């Protein structure tokens, strides 16, 4: 069964690597719908985007298809980003996961990004009428769970409008991971692979924000190593990431100290060639059927940062 699933994932990965030119090496600023690649979940933001091989929260679903493989019971929830200075007015994502049986998981997600009135300027810099901008995306997917080899596939429809210009996207995500044992896991994903309608901003074609990410996560059972009756664990992740319009790869590192599923303290650091590096942080709490998450991702260039809030309910 795993070979039958691995083959299409492998073919999709090869196709993604083979998508050269305008689709993969677009150059700086060559992609549209970049909101589909920004961090959306508190946990991912706190880990600076690391941890693709070991998702824990279903809220990671819209950026990491492998999040569906971590589902053990039905869950619904939402996440919101509170932007710092010079950010959007609102970003909300809603997610849902449902185990169909002992093997498969159905997942769905919806997200909306909205800006308030934006001051218009003409080619000479003079003020014109205000305009609005917004974007949304809906997705559905299927994956497996409870297996050493995990996989997930997602389909997404996206829409973006800026003033009187609009763009449609029909995209797909795929991911596969392998847990060697309870201490080490490897994973890789292809996200936003597909087609977007032409939108001629400034006379330049813009492609989908296709991205590749691969990583490894190691778990250190602190309690066992110290021969303590403790359930504290340390999870360390290292990932490599590249979006189609990036000239260089990003290196992402994240750490999570957790006590069972009750509490998790998180921090991350990313080496981003095109932007400033910074340390992110966050916390996660599980209380019965309720899941609460918070993450903070700084934006040094603007002297502020984004706050990520998430609430989920398992049933």
Q: Where in the sequence are the language-model features?
A:
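A periodicity- and composition-biased signal for non-globular, repetitive helical segments
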Residues: 9-10, 40
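Positively charged n-region of N-terminal signal peptides that target proteins for export
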Residues: 1-5
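Subset of outer-membrane beta-barrel
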Residues: 19-315
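Hydrophobic h-region of N-terminal signal peptides that target proteins for export
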Residues: 10-19
